[in-house]
């Protein structure tokens, strides 16, 4: 598990990115998704099957997991389940932060910190 201070730093980075995105793309959501409900349901079913299979093989990838979460959010939106859509979008954000944590572990800063802590991971 990642150090909570680092996770807060990542969330602060996300907040900064949101502010920047609001300026850069002020009308980002004129439409949430223009694909049909049927197309989204089909894409989601396929993605869930592939992700379940990958997890069973121990070969799950971040990119595929976040795609599934996005599709789940769109599906909820398409059927008018807005509270569920918000929950799914929170899961998208959680998977994005987990991706940040994964990449951080590849940085020299993390490696130096781990070495300083006697090889103990965050």
Regions found by a protein language model. Give the residues of each.
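Flexible "arm" and connector segments at domain edges
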Residues: 1-122
């Amino acid at each position: 598990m990642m150090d909570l201070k680092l996770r807060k730093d990542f969330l602060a980075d996300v907040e900064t990115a949101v502010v920047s995105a609001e300026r850069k793309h002020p009308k980002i959501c004129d439409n949430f998704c223009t694909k049909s409900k049927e197309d989204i349901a089909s894409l989601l079913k396929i993605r869930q099957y592939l992700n379940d299979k990958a997890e069973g093989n121990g070969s799950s990838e971040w990119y595929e997991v976040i795609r599934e979460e996005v599709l789940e959010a769109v599906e909820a939106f398409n059927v008018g389940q807005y509270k569920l859509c918000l929950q799914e979008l929170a899961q998208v954000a959680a998977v994005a932060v987990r991706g940040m944590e994964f990449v951080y572990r590849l940085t020299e800063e993390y490696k130096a910190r781990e070495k300083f802590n006697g090889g103990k991971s965050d």
